[in-house]
Amino acid sequence: MAETPYSSAPGTATSQTDDPGAAQTPEALRTPTKRLSLGFILMLCLANVALWFSMQPVTNILVPEQVDRFDPDPSRQIFYNGLILFGGALLSVFSNPVGGALSDRTTSRFGRRVPWLIGCGALSAGALALMANANGIALLFIGYGLYQLIVNGALAALIAVVPDKASEQQRGFVSAFVGLTLPVATVLGAVVVGLLITNIQIGYYILAVTLVVVMVLFSLMLHDARLPRSAVKPFRLGEFLRGFWINPRQHPDFGWAFLSRFLVNVGWNTTVGGLLYQYLKYGVKVSNPAASVAIAQIIAVVMIVLSSIVGGYLSDRFQRRKVFVIVSAAMIAVALLVLALVTSWTAVLVAAVIVGLGFGAYLAVDLALLTEVLPSANDRAKDMGVFNIANALPGAIGPLAAGILVPVFGSFQPLFFMATGVVLLAALTILPIKSVR
């Protein structure tokens, strides 16, 4: 018999859950127990790569290059770049949890996630086309904002697939591979857009087409369970809005996990995560910043691949999450400290190795930890969307703060020292989590 994406491993029970009440629980809301096939995991990874591939080079390369062409003044470039990223990230703070909550309530015959993957994927492609034809800062600002508003609807649906489909015993393994997709997509985007394609418009169009095609292919394979209308509470705006508040006193582990991820991203996005192009151009003074971004990211991703797979495997093997997250966050802090102490291309390469080793394990194991502290199975996409604020909000305030502070300080170094301390604090906030070892 042909293997399905959710076929059980030999000897695994075929029932969806051991809970006697499972028969009354809609399939879409049951806790998964079946092992995912390798084919499905790879397709899930491809979908994540395509989504991040459409996002990362836009933020890291295309927008900075467009700003560079629109305004030659270095100080204004850093400010405008930060302003554009701030506007888009601020909208993503709103759209990701709202999109996730609406996805959780979707009762389409195609399932809860598929309509959002395909619909938002297609609309995101349109926003990319708008940015490709921007003729100034204002239109670029509008286009980037629209893009972030829409694409985060697809992201909210896609990140919910892991808790939707992966059993607790397999989440570390699946999360390790899914965690790899961000750095892989970042390097792929840097190589394609930063090295191979020098035309900005063509770069945008490649990202748009790739996103739409892969979202459709993954949706065809997803077999997304339909949520019965009877399982959805009547929509009440006040109750819907209150649902976005997850009380950290009632769910302290979720709160600590949120704070840790938030602090890691503040440290990262205030420095190289939001200003790598400008740092290499004006701090290190490389001759080709776009190519240098690609080289540094390629080195980092090689390390990320190794540490993500090893970290995810060991985390599952020993059923430990916290120690891996703490150590990996500390390694990210060490990489930022290297850049704070030494301004050179060699230091960038050394930091790329260290941060790759740290981020790989961090992305893999922290995602696995998160799926184990979600408050409710009924609201996985919404809760993941709320958690994604810890990714999106630093993406908003980090580049803007850096764009203001770098001209004040006169250099990038003070930011790197501040970021090092923030990321070390992020490692410590994992310690109070009690429900996960």
Regions inferred by a protein language model and the residue ranges of each:
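Juxtamembrane intracellular "pre-TM" segments in multi-pass secondary transporters
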Residues: Q16-S37, A225-L259
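Helix-loop boundary and gating motifs at the non-cytosolic
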Residues: P26-A89, D253-K285
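Glycine-rich segments within core transmembrane alpha-helices of 12-TM secondary carriers
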Residues: S92, G172-G194, N388-G398
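Helix-to-loop junctions at the C-terminal end of transmembrane segments
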Residues: S95-F110, S307-R320, V406
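Structural signature of the two symmetry-related core transmembrane helices
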Residues: R113-A129, V323-V338
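Multi-pass alpha-helical transporter architecture, strongest
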Residues: A132, V214-H223, F417-R437
